[in-house]
Amino acid sequence: MATLLRSLALFKRNKDKPPITSGSGGAIRGIKHIIIVPIPGDSSITTRSRLLDRLVRLIGNPDVSGPKLTGALIGILSLFVESPGQLIQRITDDPDVSIRLLEVVQSDQSQSGLTFASRGTNMEDEADQYFSHDDPISSDQSRFGWFENKEISDIEVQDPEGFNMILGTILAQIWVLVAKAVTAPDTAADSELRRWIKYTQQRRVVGEFRLERKWLDVVRNRIAEDLSLRRFMVALILDIKRTPGNKPRIAEMICNIDTYIVEAGLASFILTIKFGIETMYPALGLHEFDGELSTLESLMNLYQQMGETAPYMVILENSIQNKFSAGSYPLLWSYAMGVGVELENSMGGLNFGRSYFDPAYFRLGQEMVRRSAGKVSSTLASELGITAEDARLVSEIAMHTTEDKISRAVGPRQAQVSFLHGDQSENELPRLGGKEDRRVKQSRGEARESYRETGPSRASDARAAHLPTGTPLDIDTASESSQDPQDSRRSADALLRLQAMAGISEEQGSDTDTPIVYNDRNLLD
């Protein structure tokens, strides 16, 4: 048996080990396409600001091709360094693209005010064609839809401080898009707006240079569909992190935004470690968790072997990311989610609608937190020198502070209330009759009358007065209402009616085991 266990441990380690590179053959290269990246050909701030202005307009042009859009974005991303060309050549190692650098200088003979640096060759026409200034119609179209403040006609400046503020504002909006461009592009707008408000309050960006939503959507879509662009951005982040000493302000801002980018798409793996293992509850000793604990141990070793690119494996489309999916350890993940929703309110809004989600182990995690509330770890107490009297005091305080948290209903609640189909009577309330039915109708009537007399906000207070005092608020519903102001009143009304019904059902007692089925179509609107 000992030999079998050793073989099993060795098998688990080798199973999740990444392939070993060998020198039997050369690197596999794909069919490359050329990306032209314009960079400043001199150290003039006017040249850089004019190039930034033309590239922002170019990205806002809907007729721009994908490779040209990628080149324009790489040019903007590298404008904050002293030598953009050296930076691009140093960090670029992409098997799918071949980058060509074009130095840009000022010109009074071109419509764009820029030309490509060359030895004795007139390149004004080519520069105008690249920056879409050869067609007056496209030139006029490119002036709209890039800044929300339509009074800004251009962003050409002469002083370095003003240029850095404008460039930092534009770069912040581009880098924020990376966090959810791959994992959750449909829900990215809210988080991006929160980041923008944060950096505006910190004076890291200038609010007047907020870019149009259409422009940001174009950039987000390009980041999502172009792996080469994401490879460049990740390589730039890693290069900034390796830089010793003080970094430029824009570089520090990029590192700050990286905290939202790092480990994107790895929430299941990270949260399972945080709530399932680091909490060290006794439930980890269950036999059901033995296999998944060894799997998670192998994945943690694999994560470390991948090096500095491991947190970006989803953004870089690394095929090994599938091993870190929660489907590889479903029981431990379900247990960790139960622990998480009890310990942190922010976990209540997570989506648990997975095919491998196990409600039994989810409830196990919840019960472990509830029954372990106020207990002090003897091992940690001995290491910290905590006496038995101090441990009892801590337990007593913790029990009082967690009573309110334990009494709240947190987590998925899909099975608590069942709604009838449309072919059933709207006013029918099964297992409610006589006195209870009249009380429901009375509470609804008083709520509607209060709404007519006092308005939406005061009517909500009036309805709240008829609720049982012991009925807790739905945290998940409240958070969703705060995120959608247009539906907040309707959601609050539905929540109050639902709580009124729940309060009535609690007064019935425990005579029946069949759950009550309510029918209120207003709750489904």
UniProtKB/Swiss-Prot annotation:
Domains: entry comment: Ncore is globular and carries regions required for N self-assembly and RNA-binding. Ntail is an intrinsically disordered monomeric domain in the C-terminus.
UniProt PTM comment: Phosphorylation at Thr-279 is required for the formation of the nucleocapsid.
InterPro entries referenced in this protein's UniProt entry, alphabetically: Paramyx_ncap
Descriptive protein name: Nucleoprotein
Ranges for region Ntail: 401-525, 404-525
Primary gene name: N
Major location (coarse): virion
Annotated residues for binding of RNA: K180, R195, Q202, Y260, N351
